[in-house]
From Swiss-Prot:
It catalyses: Hydrolysis of terminal non-reducing N-acetyl-D-hexosamine residues in N-acetyl-beta-D-hexosaminides. Keywords: Glycoprotein, Glycosidase, Hydrolase. This is Beta-hexosaminidase. Optimum pH is 5.0 with pNP-GlcNAc and 4.0 with pNP-GalNAc. Half maximal activity observed at pH 3.0 and 6.5 with pNP-GlcNAc and at pH 2.5 and 5.5 with pNP-GalNAc. Retains over 90% of its activity between pH 6.5-8.0 with pNP-GlcNAc, and between pH 6.0-7.5 with pNP-GalNAc. Detected in dry seeds and cotyledons.
Length: 26
């Protein structure tokens, strides 16, 4: 597994998680 692929997947996961958190607060 390429480490850059992991980093990209992690960024997407974090961004998606942040959207859910902001949505629940709003």
């Amino acid at each position: 597994v390429d480490s850059e692929d992991l980093i990209e997947a992690f960024k997407i996961y974090v961004e998606d998680d942040n959207e859910h958190l902001q949505g629940s607060v709003d």
